[in-house]
Structure formats: C-alpha cells, structure tokens
Design a protein with these regions (language model features):
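Metallocofactor- and cofactor-centric catalytic cores in central/energy metabolism, strongly enriched
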Residues: 1-172
C-alpha cells in the first residue's frame, strides 16, 4: 500500500550474490540477477531504488555506481560496511532476531523513500530475459530427475544448451 501511494506498482525483491539466494528464489520469490562480480552492471541499469548488503561479498565500488543513479545503499553487518552507506544494524548471530520484522519494515520504508527521490533517473533494462533453473546441486538433480542421466541426455541432445555455474564467494 505504501509503495502504491508513492506511485509505484509494488515492491519486488531481487538477489545478487551467494548466501542462500537459491533458497530465497525457490521458497520466497526473490529473483536472482547476478553474483557479486557483476553486481555493478545490475546497479548500472538504474532500476534499483535500494541496495542492501548483509554478510555477503560486496565491492566498495558499488557506492560510486549507486551515486550515479541516486540509489540508496544500506548495510546490515560489520563485514559489509561501506563508506557513505546507511547502517541498519542486524546481528547475523541472531542476538537481535526479535527486531527482524521492525528492521524489514524500516528497510521497505526507506526503499519507498528512495523510489520517490529517484523519479526522473534514467533506467535501462536490457530488452531480453533468460529462463533459468537456479540453485541446483547433485542432490537436487537426483530429486528432480531421479538420476544424472536425464540431465546428461538433455545436454547431449541439445535440449539444454549449457549449464552455468554461477556460485557465490568467487571474488578475488
């Protein structure tokens, strides 16, 4: 409701990086866009109103790209502190887990404020999409297909053109 009052169609959540992204995609509808190595490219579309970094890898250059597109950057952990980012403290060891809902509400409100402040910022979203199956492991392939054989056959026959291994924590 708050987002619609601000003129937005709604709120969408996207994921960039590693920790838990496949589970967030599969069970919570968080759409994966990239890993940390190409995160600046995603931010460079101008389409993101708020960028939040928790304990995952994030490069300091993200702040320079965010400035170009007036994107708000929030960090929630000691390991992802960035000069110029807003700080919303959350302990990944769960000492303040009781504050999770309140923190999430603050972040959503801040995203809506950022949306309002960014009106007029140029946005370029490439005109294509790619269907992908993400977050699979050997165990997942066995559960989904019964064995590795159907996957191997689909690759050999050309039904699947390739497999991309986009893993987290591949940063230098």
């Amino acid at each position: 409701e708050l987002a619609k009052k601000a003129g937005a169609k709604g709120i969408r959540f996207y994921g960039i990086c590693c920790s838990g992204l496949s589970a967030m995609y599969r069970y919570a509808g968080v759409i994966p866009l990239s890993n940390a190595v190409s995160a600046e490219l995603v931010l460079g579309t101008g389409a993101l109103d708020l960028w939040i970094a928790d304990v995952q890898d994030v490069f300091p250059s993200i702040m320079e790209v965010a400035k170009c597109f007036q994107t708000t950057v929030i960090t929630t952990s000691e390991s992802a502190r960035l000069p110029g980012a807003e700080r919303f403290e959350y302990d990944h060891h769960h000492s303040n887990i009781g504050e999770t809902r309140e923190l999430a509400e603050r972040i959503v409100k801040r995203a809506i404020e950022s949306f309002e402040n960014r009106k007029g910022v140029p946005v370029y979203i490439p005109p294509y999409e790619v269907d992908a199956e993400v977050g699979f492991s050997v165990e997942y392939v066995h559960k989904r297909f019964g064995s590795m054989a159907p996957l191997a056959e689909a690759v050999k026959s050309g039904k699947i053109l390739g497999i991309v291994n986009m893993v987290g924590c591949n940063n230098p």
